[in-house]
Amino acid sequence: MRGKLAIILLIVFFANPLAAQELTGTLQQIKKSGQIRIGYRVSEPPMSFLDKDGNPTGYSIDLCKSIVTEVENKIGADVKVEYVPVTADGRFKALSDNKIDILCGSTTKTLSRSELVDFTQLTFVTGASLMTLKDNNDHDSGGLDGKKIGVVKATTTAVELKKLIRETSIDAEVVLFNSAKESIDALRKKKIDAFSSDQIVLIGIAVKAHDPMSFEISDGVFSFEPFALAVRRNDADFRLVADRVISDLYRSKKIL
């Protein structure tokens, strides 16, 4: 009799919603609102960009779509996905101000940024490089004296580019832009001589261009850029969901 009573009590306990783990932080907010907001950069191929129909797409966007599926499983409900475009200099504030729930793009994980946001496991590794027009082959550091080099402001590439110029005593001018698109437009119009960004992004830009053979990309890199997705600080449960998805994808070899 006592054994039967114990079994009944266990069934009641585990059937009680209060016995289940309570949702907290971002997961709780997503279930309550019924939506998840994905922050992304609009011109950072192949990580995040707009397709021909104006829809967000890319490697990081695909990762975040997989995370959304796992979030739905975790909270036991379907959610609406809202894509929120962000800039390089406004992306972390968008997270801290609760305007987005996760940052999916080409964001480098650094210690200083970890004071502002939390990062997932690494999603990609690249390095900063240089792009020029093919009729201008001064893309090696030795040929940049007197040149103008464009870079997106509030990026690690901007920091590393200025460091490179300082340490090698190159007489080059750094020109800051709000986006990769603005930088490429300036390069095409020859307002700058080169554009510096993460090498994988430079390759993505060239591949997507209507005239990919017009660009020259330096073989070398001058920085180490480990990419990761970003979430709000001290939200371990939500970050764990994202980390689990990323880990499972790598183990499954769906991404290499």
Predicted regions and their residues:
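A ligand-binding cleft/hinge motif common to bilobed small-molecule-binding domains
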Residues: 90-93, 104-116, 160-167, 188-223
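Bacterial N-terminal signal peptides
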Residues: 6-16
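Periplasmic-binding protein-like
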Residues: 42, 124-133, 199, 206-247
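Extracytoplasmic small-molecule ligand-binding "clamshell" domains
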Residues: 21-104
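Acidic, polar ligand-binding/catalytic clefts
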Residues: 65, 69, 76-143, 213-221
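Bilobed "Venus flytrap"/periplasmic-binding protein-like clamshell domains
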Residues: 37-46, 56-72, 108, 126-180, ...
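Ligand-binding clefts/hinges and TM-proximal coupling segments of bilobed small-molecule sensing domains
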Residues: 20-24, 31, 156-175, 213-217, ...
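Extended ligand-binding regions for polar small-molecule ligands
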Residues: 21, 62-70, 137-138, 142-143, ...
